[in-house]
Regions:
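Intrinsically disordered, low-complexity, compositionally biased regions/tails
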Residues: 17-18, 49
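C-terminal motif of bacterial Sec signal peptides marking the signal peptidase cleavage site
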Residues: 20-23
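Residue-level marker of intrinsically disordered, low-complexity segments enriched
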Residues: 15-17, 125
Length: 171
């Protein structure tokens, strides 16, 4: 009886800790629209990538690639005020890419530098690949295939081999 109570208490304690941790916000989530961009750099450090936006603003990015699955992106207006902050390596963000319309520049500005680039000569396609978490559960790779003019012609998602339990001890 005593061991049963102890196991139940430990399980309940572990569940409470897990619940509390899920409520923890990421540092960028507490930055409201309209805040000065310096608030972000104070919390996250200087951005590793900066891109110009069509309206004259900037997109600041803090990637965790090549081994991470997250890139925090902040859109900042010309006066240096935050418009929005979000995690861009996400299936809903990837699905915004328009086949036949988006270019390499569009992909770069929206998702940052890829974790991997390759070229398939028989397809005549350059491929940019990004790591991400799908539904915060599955480790995935999302790839953009570009034609010779740099236009997105195909996208593809696949499981991330880095997290494949059958391939962990290859070497």
């Amino acid at each position: 009886m005593r061991n049963t109570f102890r196991c139940l208490r430990n399980a309940l304690g572990g569940a409470c800790v897990a619940l509390l941790l899920t409520g923890c916000a990421q540092p960028w989530q507490a930055v409201p629209p309209g805040a000065d961009a310096s608030v972000l750099t104070a919390r996250l450090g200087p951005p590793r990538e900066v891109y110009d936006l069509p309206d004259g603003g900037k997109r600041l990015m803090w990637p965790t690639q090549p081994l991470g699955e997250f890139t925090t992106a902040a859109d900042v207006d010309v006066s240096g005020k935050v418009i929005n902050v979000r995690q861009v390596l996400d299936e809903n963000e990837f699905y915004k890419a328009q086949i036949g319309v988006w270019t390499k520049k569009d992909v770069l500005v929206n998702f940052g530098r890829p974790v991997e680039t390759s070229y398939f000569p028989l397809m005549k396609r350059e491929v940019w690949t990004y790591r991400y978490m799908e539904a915060n559960i599955w480790y995935m790779m999302y790839s953009f295939y570009f034609d010779d003019q740099g236009i997105v012609r195909l996208t593809q998602k696949t499981p991330d081999p880095l997290h494949d339990p059958d391939r962990r001890n290859v070497f």
